[in-house]
């Protein structure tokens, strides 16, 4: 995803990245393949890129709802406003992490945000428990991409890894404690991706 310095102030704030980091330069997020975000490739008749629409910075609400449904009983239902709230939260979280990663790139005078930058940002922002599992996932992802590129198919590698993290992977439950406003602790179930389905990757353990 390429963010050019020509983007408007409103667009930059929507993405959670200040103008100081993108003014006069651009940052590129590359997943080690040549695939580009088609959204940024659309140009109007004057040759300028279209402004981001609000829905363009959100994950598809159907995908968000599908993940949410995995965390509730089969008979449970989720209201539309709840789905929209989580959809916006996910977008804010992505912008939050990416903004921190872009700051590191800015300090090191780089223009490409890589996987290590994201891991560094998550650690800096207090998401340490996710860093080690994500390091292993990133390693496996790169190995898969490298292996498939060697036999002529980066897309196949991505598809193959996606199959290992398919929808049914969100079935494992991890016990966790939830501290309520009155100081009481409640037991809840946290649904996470089945990291053990990828060789060498372990589940996140909550204490």
Swiss-Prot record:
Region (B domain) residue spans: 53-142
GO cellular component: CCAAT-binding factor complex
Keywords for this protein: Activator, DNA-binding, Isopeptide bond, Nucleus, Transcription, Transcription regulation, Ubl conjugation
GO molecular function: DNA-binding transcription activator activity, RNA polymerase II-specific; DNA-binding transcription factor activity, RNA polymerase II-specific; protein heterodimerization activity; sequence-specific DNA binding
Principal location: nucleus
A domain, as annotated region: 1-52
Pfam families: CBFD_NFYB_HMF
Keyword Ubl conjugation: yes
Biological processes annotated in GO: regulation of transcription by RNA polymerase II
Subcellular locations according to the entry: Nucleus
Family (UniProt): Belongs to the NFYB/HAP3 subunit family.
Subunit and partners: Heterotrimeric transcription factor composed of three components, NF-YA, NF-YB and NF-YC. NF-YB and NF-YC must interact and dimerize for NF-YA association and DNA binding. Interacts with C1QBP.
Stated name of the protein: Nuclear transcription factor Y subunit beta
Species whose genome carries this gene: Equus caballus
Organism placement in taxonomy: Eukaryota, Metazoa, Chordata, Craniata, Vertebrata
């Amino acid at each position: 995803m390429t963010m050019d310095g020509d983007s408007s102030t409103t667009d930059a704030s929507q993405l959670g990245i200040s103008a100081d980091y993108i003014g006069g330069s651009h940052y590129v997020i590359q997943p080690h393949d040549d695939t580009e975000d088609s959204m940024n490739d659309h140009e109007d008749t004057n040759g300028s890129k279209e402004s981001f629409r609000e829905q363009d910075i959100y994950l598809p609400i159907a995908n968000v709802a599908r993940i949410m449904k995995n965390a509730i009983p089969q008979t449970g239902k989720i209201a539309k406003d709840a789905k929209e709230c989580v959809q916006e939260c996910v977008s804010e979280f992505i912008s939050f992490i990416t903004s921190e990663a872009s700051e590191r790139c800015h300090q090191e005078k780089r223009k490409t945000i890589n996987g290590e930058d994201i891991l560094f940002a998550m650690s800096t922002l207090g998401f340490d428990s996710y860093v080690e599992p994500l390091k292993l996932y990133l390693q496996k992802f790169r190995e898969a991409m490298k292996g498939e590129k060697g036999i002529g198919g980066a897309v196949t590698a991505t598809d193959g890894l996606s199959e290992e993290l398919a929808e049914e992977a969100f079935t494992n439950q991890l016990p966790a404690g939830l501290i309520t406003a009155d100081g009481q602790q409640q037991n809840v179930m946290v649904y996470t991706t089945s990291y053990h389905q990828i060789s060498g990757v372990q589940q996140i353990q909550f204490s």
